[in-house]
């Protein structure tokens, strides 16, 4: 039973982690393109997602802080 639960949690966490990375990549892509408005919009969308994943324990709070600091 534990193995089945672990596999389910692993897939769920992988999905959430992938989603978070995608939002972070969108911010970097907007910055690379030089579009300040799009970068700000992408950053504002990314922030609560990263915060939520850190609160749930998917990533460490310091990693959350590092992502946000590097992109501001």
Curated annotation (Swiss-Prot):
Domain of life here? Bacteria
Read off the lineage from the record.
Answer: Bacteria, Pseudomonadati, Pseudomonadota, Gammaproteobacteria, Enterobacterales
Query: A single GO molecular function, which one?
Result: small ribosomal subunit rRNA binding
What are its GO cellular component terms?
cytosol; small ribosomal subunit
Role, per record = Binds directly to 16S ribosomal RNA.
Organism (species): Klebsiella pneumoniae
Gene that specifies this protein: rpsT
Which keywords, in A-to-Z order, does the entry hold? Ribonucleoprotein, Ribosomal protein, RNA-binding, rRNA-binding
Give the GO terms filed under biological process for this record.
translation
> What's the family?
Belongs to the bacterial ribosomal protein bS20 family.
Name this polypeptide is given:
Small ribosomal subunit protein bS20
> Known Gene3D superfamilies for this protein?
Ribosomal protein S20
- List the InterPro entries hit by this protein, alphabetically: Ribosomal_bS20, Ribosomal_bS20_sf
